[in-house]
Curated annotation (Swiss-Prot):
EC category name: hydrolase
Species classification: Eukaryota, Metazoa, Chordata, Craniata, Vertebrata
Residue numbers binding 3',5'-cyclic GMP: 791, 992
Protein name per UniProt: cAMP and cAMP-inhibited cGMP 3',5'-cyclic phosphodiesterase 10A
Pfam families: GAF, PDEase_I
Entry keyword annotation includes Nucleotide-binding: yes
Compositional bias annotation for Low complexity: 220-231
UniProt subcellular location: Cytoplasm, Cytosol
Catalytic activity: a nucleoside 3',5'-cyclic phosphate + H2O = a nucleoside 5'-phosphate + H(+); 3',5'-cyclic AMP + H2O = AMP + H(+); 3',5'-cyclic GMP + H2O = GMP + H(+)
Disease: Dyskinesia, limb and orofacial, infantile-onset: An autosomal recessive, early-onset hyperkinetic movement disorder characterized by axial hypotonia, dyskinesia of the limbs and trunk, orofacial dyskinesia, drooling, and dysarthria. The severity of the hyperkinesis is variable.
Binding annotation for 3',5'-cyclic AMP: 562-563, 606-607, 640, 659, 791, 992
Amino acid sequence: MASLEEPLAPRPQGPLPAAGDEPGCGPGKLRPEPRLSAAGGGSAAGPGPAPEWPGRGRAERAAPPRPPLSSAGRPSPAGGPGALSARGGGCGWVAARAPLALAFSSRVPSSSPSFFYFWPPPPPPPPSFLPSSSAFHLPVRLPGREGAAAAAAAGGGGDAGGGGGGGQEAAPLSVPTSSSHRGGGGSGGGRRRLFLSPALQGLLLPARAGPRPPPPPRLPLGQAARRAGSPGFPGAGPGGGGQTPRRPQGASFALAAAAALLFGSDMEDGPSNNASCFRRLTECFLSPSLTDEKVKAYLSLHPQVLDEFVSESVSAETVEKWLKRKNNKSEDESAPKEVSRYQDTNMQGVVYELNSYIEQRLDTGGDNQLLLYELSSIIKIATKADGFALYFLGECNNSLCIFTPPGIKEGKPRLIPAGPITQGTTVSAYVAKSRKTLLVEDILGDERFPRGTGLESGTRIQSVLCLPIVTAIGDLIGILELYRHWGKEAFCLSHQEVATANLAWASVAIHQVQVCRGLAKQTELNDFLLDVSKTYFDNIVAIDSLLEHIMIYAKNLVNADRCALFQVDHKNKELYSDLFDIGEEKEGKPVFKKTKEIRFSIEKGIAGQVARTGEVLNIPDAYADPRFNREVDLYTGYTTRNILCMPIVSRGSVIGVVQMVNKISGSAFSKTDENNFKMFAVFCALALHCANMYHRIRHSECIYRVTMEKLSYHSICTSEEWQGLMQFTLPVRLCKEIELFHFDIGPFENMWPGIFVYMVHRSCGTSCFELEKLCRFIMSVKKNYRRVPYHNWKHAVTVAHCMYAILQNNHTLFTDLERKGLLIACLCHDLDHRGFSNSYLQKFDHPLAALYSTSTMEQHHFSQTVSILQLEGHNIFSTLSSSEYEQVLEIIRKAIIATDLALYFGNRKQLEEMYQTGSLNLNNQSHRDRVIGLMMTACDLCSVTKLWPVTKLTANDIYAEFWAEGDEMKKLGIQPIPMMDRDKKDEVPQGQLGFYNAVAIPCYTTLTQILPPTEPLLKACRDNLSQWEKVIRGEETATWISSPSVAQKAAASED
């Protein structure tokens, strides 16, 4: 027995070399590799010293670094066991050390090699050593593959690398046995031994014979990978035709045969107690660490071994079982998608160029057709086409036009008609009709296209790739036609995929550009609307400024040369305008000239038709349209090419027409221009409507001012009237009668203003108001009472007298402000009464009902009172402080509102409850307000407390006003209530009886309870009630006899 013992060598520094880069590396010869350290680094090498490499070879630098793999195919820790640098094709030379690892590369692309590692422990010590200066080679018979088979030693060993063998060449395992050899023991791991029997030494040592082959030529990684395994390439796989010298193969064939038999037995019979042939092989020469997973991995890398074995040794029944088991798996498992074509650097460059073009056009706002042409040029380069043609849809979308880019002298691109969209003509027409991509290898031999491409150079074209250009919403906008000339390779599926992907991306990108442009336009439009709004509110009356602003932006919105705006006169059925675009600019803005207004019939011209129909007209060629009036161009010398005419609609009616003339950039106004203009026209309609409405308001305001001036003249008293009142003195005989509740002011009409002045002075003092202002105020109030049957000036003075009588009999209960406010409130409580009830005004939507939803007339009375107080020389409360002024106005307001009979019922009920429970407190302001409200109702109804003849005459006046309202309701087809129906005048006594019992008697009863001095009002009301009962019974007396208390007071007053 021979033994081998060698020391561990230090690890060299520097990166690993590539396959074939170092000298002396090739088939049949060990390639120097970096040594492994004791922890797993370093390498194993063949006999002789190996140089330290300063860097990797070209192929190694070209390929990305890959981590070492574990025995299960997973990456191992850097520098750990299993680190591999073996490369080559077919079988490879492997440097063997203890422990050893075998690695095999699969037939997969060179960009992603896979290796399999064996990592056995060291064998037990053998009885003998090999000579220290020798190394043995283990030829292992493995089928030739494109990937390399390598074995590497780790821990105490290194990795191995070798070129591929050719044909059926065996892959020898080389075990260096001398410390002078590169690839000796690793550093830091002590000394290790490898023991082999003499029989094995005799079997293995003959493999050292024969010279080593020269190294393969240096090639780039990709080229080397393609040439590996090809005929004539040194180190090729099976049948490669390499020049590798053959070695003695007796031992190799014997071992390979034994391995195949044992391995086949395991595959056929399944797992057994005996190890597989491959495991036995490793147990004999390497270690017992081989597993079933490693065998499976090896077979996946070398499927031809399994193919040979299955075809020779496995029965058909067993194969059928395998197929059934395979088919039972889920059909949803899909193979990984091939994405390599989308990782091509050529396509990445195309995408970068497309991005660049899109960004440029997005910034400059270039035309989409020119942009598509430039993108098509990039796709031409990507597909290596000899040329291309770009088609766009013609008018009505039923024909194609070939796009010709602008030349040096030409300023604009051109669209040349190429023919209709139909099958049986050209390739482009066929694709436009079907909207499907078409690849034609020989266009001249295809009977579907008798006209071929339709291009002038069509005779030289052989292969054609034609693709539709479709927008994101599915609309066809063009056709891209790529072609190659005769003698060139035809387009293939990969070219179609590249062109389709890039064109689809370009379509989406252009759509995004259009969206961005739309957003930019929308932002610009929003800014304009804000600007117009600012202009409108800053100078709302200047409608000409607004129209000019609208026309300026309308031109910029659609990029038009001229603009005109006509307003519609529906009354005369005419269009008119006095603001015109003269084509000049000042400080970068168009100049509009205001001239004499021109008018023309709505039946003439394009603008007239738009005004009549309300439809948008987009005319690409004005002279081809019979509706266009050429006389305008002849008169002005201006040439009209195209027109976009838009109606301005407000409330379903056309109020104006905006006409854009001549698109500056482009052949005609586009659909996008129409859509933007429609949105703009909506705001124009709003702005014009508001401007016209404000104009009408201003006109109405002027009329209102003139009317108010007239009214003020007739509603304000003259100086003679108020000066005469200042000189008035009440007769002495009336001074006593005024103090009575039943005093009738009827016979003293000329004295009514003087009577009120007297009552104010008696109740509030002579210095409470300035006499001049008081006289002005009273006489103006008199003028503002209308001549209606009941709610007139007489009624106002009568109510004021009743309040004066109550205040005089309860003088200490009320403050000076309250007395002033209540007397003025009674005088003004029916100011400007129209003779109609609140229900009538609300039912027929009177303007007063729109102003005041509740207590309509009462709120109007208070408003009129304040208006008179605000007149010059009429503010009788001017001497009061600010707080007192507010208090007295609030007293007047509450008092006047309380005269609404609808509020009376709730107010009286609350007061009755408070009186019965003893909770009424006149020091409480809310209670006080309720009492004042009840006093105002009692004064308003005081006609029922007068002497019977006065009461009866007043009732006639009341019913005259009611019947007048009923007559108006009948005119409108509405049946009035009986109280207002003139035809039911016989029911008046019954109505009065109900009114007394429901309203008057309860009112005066509660008032008497709260203010006992007002009892004469209750007694007089009851006397009149008895008179109405007599009328109903037909017992009315010719002469009215009052109750003793009232008669006595009347006699006393006469004395």
